[in-house]
Amino acid sequence: MNRSIRKVAVLGSGIMGSRIACHFANIGVEVLLLDIVPRELNDAEKAKGITAEHPAFRNRIVNDSLQQTIKASPAPLYSPGFASRIKTGNFDDNLADIKAYDWVMEVVVERLDIKKSLFEKVDALRKPGTLITSNTSGIPIHLMAEGRSDDFRKHFCGTHFFNPPRYLRLLEIIPTPETDQSIVDFLMHYGDLFLGKTTVLSKDTPGFIANRLGIYALIQTIRVAAEMGLSVDEVDKLTGPVAGRPKSGTYRLSDVVGLDTTVHVANNLYSSGEGKDESRDAFVVPEIMQKLYDNKWLGDKSGQGFYKKVKDEAGKSVILALDFSTLEYKPSGKVKFETLEGTKAISDVSKRFAVLVAGRDRAGEFYRKTFADIFKYASLRIPEISDEIFRIDQAISAGFGWQYGLFETWDAIGVKNMLSIMESLDLKPAAWVYEMLAAGNESFYKVENGKRSYYDIASKTYKKIPGQESFILLSNLSDNIVWKNAGANLYDIGDGILNLEFKSKMNTMGSEVIEGINKGISLAEKDFRGLVIGNESSEAFSAGANLAMLFMFAIEQEFDEINMVIAQFQQTMMRARYSSIPVVTAPHTLALGGGCELNLHADKVVAHAETYMGLVEFGVGIIPAGGGTKEMALRCSDMYHAGDTELNILQTAFMNIAQAKVSTSAQELREMNYLQDKDQIVLNRSRLIVEAKQAAIELADNGYTQPKQRNDIKVQGKTGIALFMAGIAQMRLANYISDHDAKIANKLAYVINGGDLSYAQNVTEQYLLDLEREAFLSLCGEKKTLERMQGLLNGGKPPRN
């Protein structure tokens, strides 16, 4: 059957239900969100004369839940307007409406009796062939299907999203023995392609994959930390970015998730593990967690947990950390370990792991104990929770935001090396690990001919990870590098397309990266058909220009050097726009300043849905001068139509730059006019480079012709400058901005309006680029601009001087 999903019904509007509904709305699906009818009228409803039959009363729970979710931070919707795609109702009046829906997803309270009762009603109302899934995080899927019709059971499956579903990539697909294989295949594909998820096939076992191993790792980390006397700050430092994990580390993660949630899952895993899990006692909640739980110090939801946010005497927010010895909160301290110092020069996280476990201080001991324990446990869970190691790694990476999964981390340390550490701690992994090594296989993964293989335990051979044909992984293509320097690699990714990867810190655009862009264009024009600019960084597509270099030149008053650097940057951006081959960019995460300008000059942008892009130069006392200001003037000019109030259109672009606005999604970039109709948004980050490559191929196949530079950009001249400056003066008078803000804004107004022209007229791109560069240079000579740059470079926020 050729299945498509146009309408989804979500049953249950709690935190997860409402957020899942929002994410389906993000992808353009029509959503029906249902919940129970309230027990009785509240005082506000009585005062308004609302009756028990009125929809405002009957849908109060679902409407309140949805509105609360929409207002949450981070936002669950790509754009607030997408909320119109969600229709609300209640189980009593609207459950029969599910007949018209393609997928019905249950997200009610975690009680088997309630779920089974609801599914009995759903079974009687659904049309045959409708997908039915549950978002349970722990109730056995097969138990929910008991007593249901044959057609229901064939189309029933677990679909476990991680919270928040917009941002966390994991979607576990958990079939029962009766689930039709075509349904499993469809959900795996749909979750990947349309929802942007890493879909992981999981067995119907307690906690599935991610929670089983993730909660084990969290609790054991807390237990080891308590035994070693490590503080909250120390543990979160050790389990944060230095180990390729989110900044939240361990304790902050617990506060975000909610201690009650963690305790609930741990207790369930303990109960369900009786007679089945040799390490069942590991799920006994540690004493410190139990104390916090009993005190109702549950984390963010209760206002305090392992951390607490308070106001200091100056009214400034301060984060305090719990002192385990006193159960009082104290200011976070600076964490320093010799082992961590030894990793500062190692940018590749995978190369840090061996250094971390080799440390001779308490940090090294912590890593050895925690890694050894979780690796042992993971090895023993095969084949119980999964038959394949790669699914375990995918679940942990996508569910918890780790750059490397458990077996990938073990590989990076060295399987034999880690085994020695485990044995020194009297820990013994599964027998299959010893068998693998005895057969001469010394790693869990291999890369051959650009494809990654995993060690398959059942066959005792290496097998290719399925689904790789949908992705291009640069980390697998080291043999395909055709040119490189200290800041960039150029890969031949096949079919006549090159890919330029930045590899500087935060992918900032210094001289090596600029050289790489020019080299990529030159090689592509000579021997290839197109150029993709994309990378696999977890931090940034590009955080912009190399501010440290610019600051150094400005301090030394090397204005000729600055002029040369900016002119070269502008020329490179223009070359990306006006080369003889298509240039396609693939932004994701952060694309700031110069990183944004590069995308503005591409023939096509293939952006990940979670792209946070903006022209942010104003914040450090300058204006965009890599063609960003010019490009926004050009795009506004293209939007002018007869009868338009042109200055209103231009003012929006001006404000986006003056406020250093950064998008909260790729969809918002469309609304900001940073993405255009020709550009594309991709939901699954893993597909980004392959989609960008396909876009470059299509442009080439369709007869790409080298564009001509524009000479028809309409600017407003003195009229526009005067109006903008009047507004700036009013802002200054009202004390909304500082004198220096006003000075920068006036420079921006001058450039974006085309300078000192007597009347509105058409100008060239180069004319605007020259204005940009002139304004940029003058601002680099300002003391307050240098203070802003220095503030950012010192790791803080630029002062609002």
Regions found by a protein language model. Give the residues of each.
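N-terminal glycine-rich phosphate-binding loop for ADP-containing cofactors
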Residues: M1-S538, A548-I581, H588-G595, L600-A602, ...
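Extended, composition-driven regions rather than compact fold-specific motifs
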Residues: A543-A545
